Amino acid sequence: MPLTERPKVDQIHIFTNEVKQLRERGIKVILLPPSYALTSFNMSKSYIDEITSTLEGDSVPFVVSPSRYAFTDTLFWNTAYHLSAEGRRLRTDLVIADLDSIGIN
C-alpha cells in the first residue's frame, strides 16, 4: 500500500530535534529504515525520498538507504509491513551487518 499523505515535515523536525538533544546528552541514536514490501516502496518512493532528505538535512540520517530494507513482496504476510519468518531472518541479518558497519556490535 503506498503512502497517501505527504510527510509532515514539521513533525520530522520535532523528531530530529529530540534526537539531537539525546545526542547532546551522550546518548547514541541510530536510525534504520523500516521494512518495505518492494511494490509499496516503489509506489511510495517520492514520499520516502522526502522523509530521507529531511532527516539528512537535519543531520539525523538513516544509517543506510531505505531501499536496503525493501524486500520482495513474497516475504510479507497480509500487509506491506508484516514480514514472514524468512523475511524477519533476512532483516535481522541486515540489521546486524549495518550495526557492525558503524562499529556497534
Regions of interest found by a model, annotated:
Residues 42-45, 52-105:
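C-terminal regions of proteins
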Residues 1-68:
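Conserved, well-ordered alpha-helix/loop/beta-strand core segments that scaffold catalytic motifs
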